[in-house]
Structure formats: structure tokens, C-alpha cells
UniProtKB/Swiss-Prot annotation:
Biological processes annotated in GO: response to hypoxia; response to stress
Molecular function via GO: ATP binding
Description of the deletion phenotype: A strain lacking this gene does not induce most genes of the dormancy regulon, due to polar effects on the downstream devR (dosR) gene. Restoration of induction only occurs when both this gene and devR (dosR) are transformed into the deleted strain.
Pfam families for this protein: Usp (PF00582)
Keyword Oxidoreductase found: no
Protein name (Swiss-Prot/TrEMBL): Universal stress protein Rv3134c
Induction (free text): A member of the dormancy regulon. Induced in response to reduced oxygen tension (hypoxia), low levels of nitric oxide (NO) and carbon monoxide (CO). It is hoped that this regulon will give insight into the latent, or dormant phase of infection. Member of the Rv3134c-devR-devS operon.
Cellular component GO terms, alphabetical: peptidoglycan-based cell wall; plasma membrane
Keywords, in A-Z order: ATP-binding, Nucleotide-binding
Family: Belongs to the universal stress protein A family.
Superkingdom of source: Bacteria
UniProt keyword annotation of ATP-binding present: yes
Native source species: Mycobacterium tuberculosis (strain ATCC 25618 / H37Rv)
Amino acid sequence: MSDPRPARAVVVGIDGSRAATHAALWAVDEAVNRDIPLRLVYVIDPSQLSAAGEGGGQSAARAALHDASRKVEATGQPVKIETEVLCGRPLTKLMQESRSAAMLCVGSVGLDHVRGRRGSVAATLAGSALCPVAVIHPSPAEPATTSQVSAVVAEVDNGVVLRHAFEEARLRGVPLRAVAVHAAETPDDVEQGSRLAHVHLSRRLAHWTRLYPEVRVDRAIAGGSACRHLAANAKPGQLFVADSHSAHELCGAYQPGCAVLTVRSANL
């Protein structure tokens, strides 16, 4: 008989890195809002064990989980913390966690940094996991004691993305910047495209502003690629909400101090 799936939780990949600690702090509000546990998971990769062997790997895992738990507890938030050490490839194990997780949170670096593939696990999870994935990229100046969101940013074409964006803005009490994109090659195209984009933006937002009247919405029109616009206008504290198909492009382009939340169309 197979093992039962773990209870639903907000899962954070912990590896001892500063980015992972920020991911745990960022995830606290998500767990508290859902009234579910915050599950901190450390994955020991057998192929990366040193001469100290499994014992050394277990010690490092316990130390990293203890440090992350202590920092979460220091927030004073009423969150239930669970910890677990798993053995295997980080990407494989975290993908398995995504089957039952309400959300998966990881740092933008770490997990696979020893192989020189900066952020590869995070970007792959963001594009392929079975639940929403938050990738946290802390600013070097931001202390590992808190992780704040100052604004949510989303492109309006995807209704699932908009729903998650409004929910995040409501949860964190911050404004939502809604972006509509148009493609234009001539001045006439720009004028016409901008006018149509404004109409499209108003139509797309009408339903959600009725459902979330407490969320302040700032509107923006952009030409060309939504990902390029979001990256070019990134500011510390912003949370970009996007479809998982944009994960690799966004995870490689956003600025320190920002975060990306990717959702699949099935993540309703």
C-alpha cells in the first residue's frame, strides 16, 4: 500500500541559503490566511554528500530547518510549523510535494547552486509544479527577519492569474497593478492599440473589482511583451503573478527584492 499524501500545507524548500529563509518568511502569511501548516522541507541529495556522509547531511538539514523555524517563530504570527528531511533529488522531491501542497515557496538561488545551475530548480518548479509556486529573490539589503510585499503586478489576459493576483493583494493589503499589452509597429497602431487595450483592461477588471472592492487597482498599458514590461518596471517588494508558461522568462528577469508567483490554469 502506498503512503497517504501529507495534509494540505504551504510547503517551503529549505537548504540553508538566505533566499530559502526569505521564502519561509514570505510564506507565513499564506499559511496563516489559509489556516493550514507551514511545512519546511529540506531535501538531502545523496549525490552531493561529502565525506561526512549521510550523518553530515542530516546534521546540516536539521540545522537549516531549526534556523528557518526560529526565524518564522520570531515573526509572532500564529502559524503551525512542520519540518521534514527528505532524501533524493531536490527537484523530484519538491515536485512530489506539489501534488498536495496549497502552495510551494522556494528561494531564487540555492537548492542546486552547487552544480552551478543558478536558480534552475526554482524556475523549473515554477513552470512545472502542480500547485502555485512562489519564487522569492531577496534584496541583499533586506534582513532575513522579514519579507514584505509592497504591490502585486499582473497581466490581465488570464483569468486564473487575475484571481490569484487579486487574492494576494487582498491578503497583503497592497495595491494591484494590472497591465494590458498591445502589439504595435506604427504610430497609428500605437494609438489604436492603446485605445483598444484600455477597453480590454476595463472589461477584464470589471468582474474582479466587484469581487474585491477593498483592493486598489492601478492600471497600465504596455507595448510588446508583458514579461519584458514587468521586468523593466520592477521595484523591490513587488510580487509578479503570472501563468506558469512565463516562469522561465520571468524568473530570469525580475530584480532583487521581488517575487514571482506562477499559477497553472488548473490551479483554481
